[in-house]
Structure formats: C-alpha cells, structure tokens
C-alpha cells in the first residue's frame, strides 16, 4: 500500500508540474491575445503614399502594423485599394475625410469607403467658423448628427478626431468636445481621441479616454516635445495652416517614446475603455528622420514595451 500511495503521489506531483508548465507556456499567448492591434494614419507618410501607394502599404505591413487609416486614396479605385489591403494583409480600419466632402456628397463618401472595406469614417478637422465659439459650431453639431445617421444606416460608424481647439470652454463652462459628444448620440458618433492634443490642452490623456469608455473604438497615439510655453497658433508654428511655411518653434511632433507622452498609461486606458484599435500618427517628421523612419521608430517603441 505504501508503494502504491507513493506512486500515486509521484504521479500527482508530475501532473501538477505538467499543468504548471502548460500554464506558464500559455501565459505569453494570453498576453498576446490581450494586445490591441496597431494601425497607422497614412497622413504620416502622405508623400510616400502619393509616390507609391501599394509599395508604401507593403512597407507599413513589413514594419509590423496591423491596419491602416486612410487620408485620401490618391485617385486609386476603392475596390483596388481593398484588394491590395487583402493581398498585403492590412486591415482598412478607417478613413479621414474632410467634412466639406461629406457635406457635398455623403453618399459617395460612404460608397467609396465601404468599397475600401473601412469600418469607420472620421471627421478629421474643422475650419475656424465650425469650432467651439465659432458662428457655425452649433450648425456643425447638427451636420455631424445627420452624417452619423447616414453612416449608421450604411453599416459604418462615424468618428470625430479632435485637435486642441475643441477644448475651448463654452459659456456653460463645458468643453466644446464634450458638448459635441453629449448632443450627438453615441450610436451616431464615436470618439477618435488624438492624445497629443488632449495632453497639449492640459488634460490627462488616460483619464480623458476613460471618460469615454465604451465610446472610443479608435485611439490616436501621438507624441510631441515642447520647450517651455507655447505662444500663438500651434498650426501656424508647425506649418499646418494652408499657405504658411513651417516656422521655428518650441513645438515638435515626435515618434512614440521620444516625447512627453506617458504612452503605456494611454494604452492601459485604451484596454479599460474597450478600444479596438491603436493608431500611430505623426503629422510632421522630426529628429532628422524621414516620415517612414518616424513610423518605424514608433512601432519599434511599441514592441519594446510589449504593446505590439
């Protein structure tokens, strides 16, 4: 009996060790499953896209990106773009489309990007008169409601991509961005928080993302560097206003991990908020790097912290 008992105990011990070993081997797979897929906003490499659309997509995939967010199709046929994405293995996540284009012909915008295979259409930027405090701000809110309804009916989801000017407070004391989200239902409009501009506006990016838990399917990861206090219009200083050349300034977009952002805290908040995609964006190259080198640096950083 003692021999049998000893044998049973030995077998049990071996079984427990075996289970423990399997559990240890399973951990990396579980961690991998928990990682959010990472895309890139192709505005970051717009010159490369214009010069070689398909070739740039192939390079983006080779870097390790899972999907892309478009900023124009550069006269390529939407169905062809969809075919290229399938061939290369990139998810066509979303597209930034000027609000003016949506207002002019939302049916065409929807048809084009459904053909591309996008899940989301994004309002990327609004002109001054449609910003909080502008004469057309309230009209813009209603325009977005209408566009959101059209997108919903077509099986797409409308997102709004913020800058810093949406954090101007209205007479009520409410931020313009919060007013937009409180006045357009979540089933018609979701967030695409650009965390660079959230931080630049003086808010905590992770905390603000958590405020919109369940309504933030796509998050823009963007880093920047700032020397001292910014004075004047940041878009003039970085040369993003139409017709203006870039001026020397204290503000500079940076690859992820090279600026002021606490990127890990944003990624953790994205998990908690139920986000589905992280999207890398860098409006202008910096640090002596070319645009493609910048997005390469960003994804290598994400790999280094275990987020990719």
Model region roles, listed by residue range:
Residues 99-191, 292:
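Active-site acidic/histidine proton-transfer and metal-coordination neighborhood
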Residues 55-59, 79-83, 87, 108-111, ...:
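Alpha-helical scaffolding segments of alpha/beta enzyme cores, especially the outer helices
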Residues 277-304:
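C-terminal/domain-terminus segments
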Residues 4-8, 19-120, 190, 296-308:
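N-terminal pre-domain/capping segments
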Residues 69, 94, 122, 159, ...:
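Conserved beta-strand positions in the central sheet of alpha/beta enzyme cores
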Residues 45-51, 67-79, 97-106, 128-132, ...:
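Acidic-and-aromatic substrate-binding clefts and catalytic sites of carbohydrate-active enzymes
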Residues 153-254:
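Acidic/histidine-rich catalytic cores of soluble enzymes
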């Amino acid at each position: 009996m003692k021999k049998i008992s000893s044998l049973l105990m030995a077998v049990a011990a071996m079984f427990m060790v075996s289970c423990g070993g399997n559990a240890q081997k399973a951990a990396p797979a579980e961690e991998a499953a928990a990682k959010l897929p990472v895309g890139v906003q192709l505005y970051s490499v717009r010159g490369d896209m214009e010069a070689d659309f398909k070739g740039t997509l192939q390079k983006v995939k080779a870097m390790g990106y899972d999907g892309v967010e478009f900023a124009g199709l550069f006269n390529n046929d939407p169905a062809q773009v969809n075919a290229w994405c399938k061939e290369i293995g990139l998810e066509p996540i979303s597209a930034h489309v000027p609000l003016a284009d949506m207002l002019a012909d939302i049916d065409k915008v929807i048809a084009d990007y459904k053909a591309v295979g996008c899940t989301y259409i994004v309002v990327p930027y609004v002109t001054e008169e449609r910003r909080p405090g502008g004469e057309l701000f309230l009209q813009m809110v209603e325009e977005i409601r209408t566009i959101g309804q059209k997108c919903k009916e077509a099986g797409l989801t409308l997102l709004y991509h913020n800058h810093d000017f949406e954090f101007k407070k209205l007479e009520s004391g409410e931020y313009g961005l919060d007013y937009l989200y409180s006045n357009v239902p979540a089933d018609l409009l979701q967030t695409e928080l650009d965390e660079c501009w959230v931080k630049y506006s003086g808010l905590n990016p992770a905390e603000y993302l958590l405020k919109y838990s369940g309504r933030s399917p796509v998050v823009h990861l963007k880093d920047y560097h700032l020397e001292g206090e910014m004075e004047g219009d940041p878009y003039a200083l970085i040369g993003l206003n139409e017709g203006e050349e870039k001026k020397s300034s204290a503000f500079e977009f940076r690859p992820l991990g090279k600026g002021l952002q606490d990127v890990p805290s944003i990624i953790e908040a994205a998990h908690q908020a139920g986000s589905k995609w992280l999207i890398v964006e860098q409006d202008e190259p910096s640090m002596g790097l070319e645009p493609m080198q910048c997005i390469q640096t960003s994804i290598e950083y994400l790999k280094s912290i275990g987020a990719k």
